[in-house]
């Protein structure tokens, strides 16, 4: 699939991995819809790249439908990149008692249910596409994490949500294969996202030193490059790719 003139939805596109992806898609000639809860940032990025912005809680059905409607109004919706997510840290039993159930539930709702909500709605629209010459009608790319495999202390909720994304990658790809729609997942390691970049420099340096090679924090551009390759390589389907510089996380 070629990116030029196709429409892509990027959830969490107002910052971090999502913003890097949105900018790459626009630079390659794609039409981009940014779906995010950060209105001011989202509108700024959308204006900057000539795209559209829709305020969206990815776990909300009506919000997701509004995003897909905006995308299909702009042309042929051929791609969804799920980057929206939250990462609260809380132990199963901490100093103040057991893990708050509402925090656990919200993490699952945003990261896992939100990703599936956007996949199912975008896929429904893509099924109506006239197929490309290869028979392809679209591609889904979701964001898991190395925490799905190497969850650290305090990451029970986050690791569960990302593990769920890993677990549904293949069955969704199989579900959608008859429609010519691919489904892939990227599991990033330690990346220089806004949340991490807010930490003290010495903490950032220590985290970067944990990465075998290259010994640095991942950049949104690194993630966007892999998204581009997945879009363009139609043999990539039903798989999770770790993008982590060979890191394996310690317990804490």
Residue spans for each PLM region:
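Catalytic Tyr-X3-Lys loop
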Residues: 78, 86, 97-119, 140-141, ...
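Conserved mid-core segment of classical short-chain dehydrogenase/reductases
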Residues: 76, 86-105, 124, 128-134, ...
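Residue(s) in the substrate-gating loop at a strand-loop-helix junction
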Residues: 145
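Canonical Rossmann dinucleotide-binding motif of NAD(H)/NADP(H)-dependent dehydrogenases/reductases
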Residues: 3-33
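Short C-terminal tail/terminal secondary-structure segment
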Residues: 150, 228, 232-252
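A conserved structural motif in NAD(P)-dependent oxidoreductases
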Residues: 211-223
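Alpha-helical segment proximal to the catalytic Tyr-Lys
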Residues: 124, 173-175
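Active-site helix of classical SDR
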Residues: 119, 161, 169
């Amino acid at each position: 699939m070629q990116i030029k003139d196709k429409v892509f939805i990027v959830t969490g596109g107002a910052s971090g991995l999502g913003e890097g992806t949105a900018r790459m898609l626009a630079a390659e000639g794609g039409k981009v819809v940014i779906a995010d809860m950060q209105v001011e940032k989202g509108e700024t990025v959308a204006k900057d790249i000539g795209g559209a912005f829709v305020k969206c809680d990815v776990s909300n059905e009506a919000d997701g439908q509004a995003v897909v409607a905006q995308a299909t109004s702009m042309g042929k919706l051929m791609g969804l990149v799920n980057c929206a997510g939250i990462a609260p840290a809380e132990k199963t039993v901490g100093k103040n008692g057991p893990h708050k159930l509402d925090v656990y539930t919200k993490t699952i709702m945003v990261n896992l249910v939100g990703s599936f909500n956007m996949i199912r709605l975008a896929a429904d629209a893509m099924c109506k596409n006239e197929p490309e010459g290869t028979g392809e009608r679209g591609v889904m790319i979701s964001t898991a994490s190395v925490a799905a495999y190497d969850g650290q202390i305090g990451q029970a909720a986050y690791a569960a949500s990302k593990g769920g994304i890993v677990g549904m990658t293949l069955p969704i790809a199989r579900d959608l294969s008859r429609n010519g729609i691919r489904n892939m997942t990227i599991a990033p390691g330690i990346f220089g996202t806004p949340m991490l970049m807010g930490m003290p420099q010495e903490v950032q340096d220590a985290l970067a030193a944990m990465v075998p090679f290259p010994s640095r924090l991942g950049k949104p551009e690194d993630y966007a490059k892999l998204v581009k390759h997945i879009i363009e390589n139609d043999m990539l389907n039903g798989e999770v790719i770790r993008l982590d510089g060979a890191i394996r996380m310690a317990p804490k």
